[in-house]
Structure formats: C-alpha cells, structure tokens
Amino acid sequence: MTREYRIEKDSMGEVKVPADALYQAQTQRAVDNFTLSRYTMPSAFIAALAYIKQAAAMTNAQLGHLEGDIAQAIANASQAVIDGQYAEQFPIDVFQTGSGTSSNMNANEVIATLASRELGYAVSPNDHVNMGQSSNDVIPTAIQVSAAINIEQQLLPALVHLSQTLADKQSELADVVKTGRTHLMDAMPVTFAQELGGWKSQIDHAAQGISHALSPIKALAQGGTAVGTGINADPRFARIFADNLSQLSHVTFQPSDNFFYNLSSQDCVVGLSGQLKTAAVALMKIANDLRWMNSGPLAGLGEIELQGLQPGSSIMPGKVNPVIPEAVTMVAAQVIGNDTTITVAGQSGNFQLNVMLPVIAHNLLESIALLTNACHALADKAIATFKVRHDNLEKALAKNPILVTALNPVIGYLKAADIAKKAYQQGRAILDVAAEETDLDRATLEALLDPKKLTQGGIAH
C-alpha cells in the first residue's frame, strides 16, 4: 500500500511529510538527514520537552505575551505528550544536530498541530510554542528536567529499596559468622551483618552523592535563550517559568544564576554522571561478591545459595547460574561506559554552546533507568532471597589458619605463623595444632579463637 504524503513548507522550502504525521517540515528534514542508528530520543526526554512547552506557555500567558486560549491549547497538547499518547511522533535519531534543535522543533511542531486541532486555527511552532525560547536553552533544560524527575521519582527510591533490603538481610543473618577474605585469600572472620553492612554503606553513600549532584541540575538553563543573554525572552520569564515547571513536575527547580554556564558547558551533568558511575561501581562490587559467595555449589566457596531462576546451560543438565548478579555487572559496565561518553561530550562546549547534547541526554537517561532497574532486581531476586549454607561456613571457619592472628599478642607473630603453616599443611583445625604447639590450655585457646568474638575487634587476653 502506497503511503500518502502532504507538502509542508519551512524557511528552506517544501518538504514531503507523511499525511498522518503530527510533525511538520523541520522534523521531516531531520528524519531524512539522520539515519545513523536505531536510537530515538528517550521517552523521559520527550516528556521533559513537553513539560517545558507547557510551563513556557503558562508563563508567557501570565506575562501577557501569549493569548490565553493558545496557551491553554499548548498546555493541553503538551500534557498529552507527557502522558505518552504520541510517542511515535518523535522519530528523530539521537545522533542529530549537536544542539538538539531537531528535537526541539519536533516537540514544537507536534504540540502546535495538536493545539491547532483543538482551537480550529493555526498555532505556530516557532512564534507560539517556542515563544521566548531557543533550542540552546530548551535542550539543556530538558536534560536537567528529565534527569531530576527520574532520579527523584525512580532512582533514589530504588537505591533506598536496595539499602533497606540489605538492612533486612543484615538483621536476618546478624549472628552468622563466616571467613573474611582479602586478596581472595582467607582472612580473619566477619559476620554476614558486617559484610552486608559494608555493601549497604556503599549504596547509601552512592545515593547521597547522587542527591548532592542534583542541586546544580535543578538550576535551569531556561531563560538564557540563544547564547545566554536572554535575548527575546521577558526578563521575568526564567523565574516564573521555574515556578510553573516545579508545580507541574512536582520537582523543585530554580533558574540558573549564570545562563552562560548552562549553555556553554554541561559540567553539572558530567558531575551527576560521575555519581551514577560511583553507584555502578558499588553494584559491580556487590554483584561480584555474590557470584563468588555462590560459586560451586561443590567446588567453589559455596557460602550462599542464590535463588535459582532459570536453567544455566543448554548442554549441562542441572546447572544453575547467578544470572541476576551477572546482569547487574553488565548494567554497571554500561553505566561506566556511558559516563565516558558523557565526559567526552561534556568537553564539546565551544564558546557559547555545547554541541553534543542529544548523546548526553541519551546516555544519562539510560544510566538512570539501568541503575533503577538493577537496584530492584538485585534487591528482590538476589539479596532478599539467598540462603546461607551454614555447613560450608562452619567447615571453612574451623580450618581457617588465619584465626591464629588472635594469638599474636599472646605467643608472638613468628610462633603463630608456624602454627598457621602446620595447620594448613596438615589440613587440621587451628585449635588442635595450637593446643599441641603452645602451653595454653584448650579452654583458653577456645576462648581466644572463638570466631564470633574475633569479629568484634580488640586485643586478645
């Protein structure tokens, strides 16, 4: 079936546009020009653009620059886009003009078409929907708004959920002692609660870092217009816009104290991405620890048993793999890679404008979404559900030669080292060898070498 087209005009001439498309000429030019990938701009970014258009229309109406009926129609159309009703009308590739002008015009055109249909007369993409704005302040603002909304409403709650799940598991395993490991080698004992507490602290610190990095993200570029001077925008626009946007999005924003900073650089986003990378590093460490602890079940550490979620091999029957920790490590790797892309893109601010904004938006929002989902998966399908293999823990503790460290203050380092070597070579319990090699009675040795007491620190007496 042959597709029908209509002719649209812009400042460069005529363009064939699909007859049923809500967008107009400039969006079609971008669709024709940019066929570099299968990635379109993230839905969260499109929603942020619509929030911006909605808040801008309200602001311009309040300032007396835009007729109330047109402003309301723009606001209604913007809300429909926010609600995801027209996702297919935003087809532009991520790899497009570096300012993101194509995506700004895509939003302007779709919203103008919808508003025109509501009113029965033409609403202009440029003169009405884009009033008092430039792509150069809209796109940086859309990055900031989409990131702030999704971090506050999605990622931070996910990190809190993971932290609480770790806390619950700490309580459940508070008295369970295991062999500690440094350099992947046997070390002094720790409790599961101590080990999980370290993980929880990583997650809590990551959440704090992300929260702190949100402060400059919430200081918006909107109002700087083309180069940061605010040309063609009412001097009151930025403050009222930020207030309106805060009410619409339920996230508190304010105007930047220096629009030149927000347009010419993406330093605040680079900083935020660095904090997302820190969270990814924490998840990578936790996931890999879980994989090691679950290794076996017979020829590995076998300290825990992760929930079996799916068959692990197409050739080896009965094999079950730690699929959730593995998936989380891949998420972490992707987020770390995204941070590198954002860092390079952040360097691309030439004079008054950064020109890698779309790829920054794509990678930043992907990182936020991936981390959100990974936190939930790790919490619900790994941390909350793993079981401890107490028999393996007790066997490893009994033969751990490093327990002799507790005897250092009593018999000296060299004597303790001899006992540790003999116990290891003979595969015997450190308690039995120490009883033979020292003049300490067994009751004293049992007290000194009690693994639970050794998790509490201090000096043996």
Go through the PLM ranges and name each one.
Residues 1-461:
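Conserved, well-structured ligand/cofactor-binding cores
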